[in-house]
Amino acid sequence: MGGWRKLAEPALPVLDPAQRLLWCGIGGSLLPSETLVRAFGNDRAARNWVPLASPERVPEFQLQSGDQLVFASKSGKTLELWTWMARLRALPGFGDLAAPVLVTQDDANPLATWGRANGCRILPIPVEVGGRFSAFTPIGTLPLAWMGHDASAFLRGGREVIGQIEVDRGPWRDRIAATVEMLLDAHRRGLTEWVLMPYAMRLDSLSAWWVQLLAESLGKVAKDGTRKGFTPIRAVGPVDQHSQLQRWMAGPRNLGVIVMTVEGAQAPEKLDPPPGSPYPGLASLQGGDILRAQAEGTTGALEAAGVPVLRWSLPALDEREVGAFMMAWQAIIGLLGFALELDPFDQPEVEDGKKRTFKRLGLG
């Protein structure tokens, strides 16, 4: 499953950003898309992005004229996807919409087979790319293109990381090696829980993507029969420094925290504290100043308490830098898996849960 290191750039269909994009998928077929829409989407994209993941019914959901459909599933067999397909087909107006775009393996899987029979455009996920490693397939590039953002720059960021790994030199190669070494050393000392805490609300969904990547790849029975792995914890700085920080500092010493910040100039703003504000000095500050101080304050408090901290700074919140970050972590996960003598690219226990679900539903 090492195909995630080869980044193709297939032609993408033109989607209208002024119309809703209904994205049916879950897990690795949704989280990269959700990450990029939340990171880069404007107000219009936020309104028009409609992820359809859980099989539960959404009250009062109706199709609208101009809705654009994407059905995304690497295997083409995802139960939640087929549930939403059935639900959408039963709604008034489905037959008036353009044929859905499919993002899946271009093989004989049920989704691809249905798509070919119904005139759908198929954007392929390479067979050798695991679902949770699919950010650099159309799972990631299609929503970027829909929003009018630079999908090529996103891929370029990923390629830069892979290029440095292949020649075994460069800042990304060094950062990846240092991170792997730190996490392995922590693992040997019993620190198996790690928090990713970006100080940027736009990166909240990036933490969700990272959680799946880490948990599904590295929670395994190793070759020697021992249970190994890491437990990832999702957080976002401006929120969770007021909630989870207490446990991290005063609770069991079995975790570390990755504090992620974004550098670069912020758009200027004016703060006008009212009379009686306990913080009149806000008039000379901006929100970005406060966010940076919070990140440094939290990091300092964690380090003073003896909690391992990995500082990770993005030079800018743009497609290239986010692409590089996501590719770096895919590489980190692969290297950690091999070092722990487990397969980071399978998920047998997930498959067991699916089989039990199908049996209970009488679906196979």
Where are these regions (language model features)?
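Internal helix-turn-beta structural module
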Residues: 308-309, 314-354
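Short helix-loop-beta junction
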Residues: 36-48, 90-91, 213-225, 301-304
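Cofactor-/ligand-binding subdomain signature composed of acidic, glycine-rich
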Residues: 1-19, 336-343, 347-349, 355-364
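Structural beta-sheet core signal
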Residues: 23, 69-71, 102-103, 196, ...
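Acidic catalytic cores of enzymes that act on phosphate-bearing nucleotides/polynucleotides
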Residues: 1-4, 11-12, 149-152, 165-301
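Active-site-proximal helix-loop elements at catalytic-domain edges
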Residues: 1-6, 100-102, 313-321
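Non-catalytic alpha/beta scaffold blocks inside enzyme catalytic domains
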Residues: 127-155, 294, 301, 306, ...
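Glycine-rich phosphate-binding loops that contact phosphosugars or nucleotide phosphates
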Residues: 13, 17-169, 355
